[in-house]
């Protein structure tokens, strides 16, 4: 294989790019073991950043200051790189991506170095991943991640058929969620994915496709953890509670409680919390601190901490699906989700159903705007939706309400960063209570735990605040029936 003169095939390339809805100086697409690339005097580091963007680890000899020129159209990546990286050596590491259509090869890492100097390749500095959100061409859509779609295939579809479809529309498989059968597909920058979504809706190979919707964290919390008491490790064999949020700050002093942790946004990075919300929820869900009206139990619980939100407080549905799957594999039995949006996603609904079928008790905040509109994931039937009340048991003024709310709980707490009010706190309080209950009664089913909670509740105020309130008296009844 040889490099192709850009001028000779520029008209062909332009037609291809504009048909895909994009035109830029650098075009990149990687699908399995095939590469599409258009570059003209493009810094090598910029090309390698494109590999990083689709989840490939990159190691580069820092002495290499090279540019890339060439046109590659669906060629074997080994052959393509041999031509494009003439004068340098490279090493490719592969993994098998498991999805509903079987195992497919996915590039795991690429190393580029001076011949004979493989040890000189260093991890290329990686920019923090941020979910690039948009409201679409018309600006009226719920927020979604640019240039991405989530796709599920019909039974009987083969990988070859699906790959042929992706070739037609210029998509590349980035990841697959085995539990739900969903593929994350990425397209070249600037692609009109809304138009492609309509096209896929008419394709007989596709069962369902969605935009990769964005959810934002509620605001109001700050970071900083002054004067924290030392935290003792939980008892051996304790059942962990998972917090799917903005992560965990390593300076918060909660390390003795962490049984597992993962960054679903930047999987190669150590767990952190640029926002602070996740760390504050971890204090409450673990029992180190308690919502107002409760006393900290003293029986701290193990934590499974998953960072699913980026530095701007945004996440995607696919990241949330991956976070749920990790929580289950890490041994959590209760999952706290102190966030939500009004977007009802079929794929998220399926992910929630799968998690519940696997034995997870799912708890989510009803929201901090009293609209009465359903907020998801709280409104899914497999999730305990939690509204907020004040110290007097009356509705917190900004708590959402409605038929989807299952229970209410105190919405205020004094946290290391100061006082805070929100249904995030209510959700974390309920999650901790249920995790305590399960630790007292290992083996309890999801249905039995939910029934025990419902039976213990104090009366709820009228107006859509659930079947009852989890206050201090209700917590005593739950744990000491």
Where in the sequence are the language-model features?
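Bacterial N-terminal signal peptides
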Residues: 10-21
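N-terminal export/assembly leaders
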Residues: 25-119, 172-179, 183
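Protease zymogen maturation seam
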Residues: 122-148, 164-167, 174-180, 191, ...
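Loop/turn elements at helix/coil->beta-strand transitions in domains of secreted/extracellular proteins
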Residues: 205-208, 237-240, 299-302, 329-335, ...
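Subtilisin-like serine protease catalytic core
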Residues: 231-241, 247-260, 268-318, 379-382, ...
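Extracellular S/T/G-rich loop segment that most often corresponds to the catalytic His/Ser-adjacent loop
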Residues: 239, 243-247, 360, 375-443
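Substrate-binding/charge-relay-adjacent region of secreted/lumenal peptidase catalytic domains
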Residues: 283-286, 314-336
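C-terminal subdomain of the subtilisin-like protease fold in secreted/lumenal serine endopeptidases
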Residues: 328, 332-337, 346, 350-351, ...
């Amino acid at each position: 294989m040889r490099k192709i003169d850009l001028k000779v095939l520029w008209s062909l390339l332009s037609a291809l790019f504009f048909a895909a809805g994009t035109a830029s100086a650098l075009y990149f697409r990687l699908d399995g073991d095939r590469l599409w690339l258009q570059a003209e005097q493009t810094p090598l580091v910029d090309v390698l950043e494109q590999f990083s963007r689709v989840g490939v680890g990159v190691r580069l000899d820092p002495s290499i200051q090279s540019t890339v020129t060439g046109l590659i159209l669906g060629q074997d990546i080994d052959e393509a790189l041999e031509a494009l990286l003439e004068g340098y050596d490279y090493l490719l590491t592969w993994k098998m991506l498991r999805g509903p259509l079987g195992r497919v090869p996915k590039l795991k890492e690429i190393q580029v170095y001076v011949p004979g100097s493989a040890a000189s390749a260093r991890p290329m500095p990686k920019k923090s991943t941020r979910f690039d959100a948009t409201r679409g061409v018309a600006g009226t859509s719920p927020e979604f991640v640019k240039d991405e779609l989530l796709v599920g295939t019909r039974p009987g579809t083969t990988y070859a058929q699906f790959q042929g479809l992706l070739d037609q529309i210029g998509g590349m498989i980035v990841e697959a969620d085995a539990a739900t059968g969903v593929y994350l597909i990425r397209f070249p920058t600037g692609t009109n994915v809304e138009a492609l979504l309509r096209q896929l809706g008419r394709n007989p190979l596709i069962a369902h496709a969605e935009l990769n919707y964005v959810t934002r964290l509620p605001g109001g919390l700050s970071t900083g953890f002054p004067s924290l008491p030392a935290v003792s490790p939980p008892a051996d064999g304790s059942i962990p509670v998972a917090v799917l949020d903005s992560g965990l700050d390593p300076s918060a002093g909660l390390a003795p409680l962490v049984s597992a942790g993962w960054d679903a946004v930047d999987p190669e990075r150590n767990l952190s919390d640029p926002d602070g919300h996740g760390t504050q929820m971890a204090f409450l869900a673990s029992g180190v601190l308690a919502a107002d009206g409760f006393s900290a139990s003293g029986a701290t619980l193990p934590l499974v901490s998953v960072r699913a939100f980026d530095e701007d407080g945004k996440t995607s549905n696919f990241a949330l699906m991956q976070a749920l799957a990790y929580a289950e594999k890490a041994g959590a039995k209760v999952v706290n989700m102190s966030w939500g949006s009004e977007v009802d996603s079929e794929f998220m609904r399926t992910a929630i159903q799968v998690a519940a079928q696997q034995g997870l008790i799912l708890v989510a905040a009803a929201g901090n705007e009293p609209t009465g509109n359903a907020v998801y994931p709280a409104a899914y039937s497999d999730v305990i939706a939690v509204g907020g009340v004040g110290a007097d048991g009356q509705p917190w003024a900004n708590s959402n309400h409605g038929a989807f709310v299952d229970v209410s709980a105190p919405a205020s707490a004094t946290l290391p960063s100061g006082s805070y009010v929100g249904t995030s706190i209510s959700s974390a309080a309920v999650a901790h209570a249920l995790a305590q209950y399960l630790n007292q009664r290992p083996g309890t089913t999801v249905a039995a735990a939910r029934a025990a909670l419902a039976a213990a509740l104090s009366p709820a105020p009228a107006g859509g605040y659930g079947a009852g309130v989890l206050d201090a008296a209700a917590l005593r009844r739950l744990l000491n029936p």
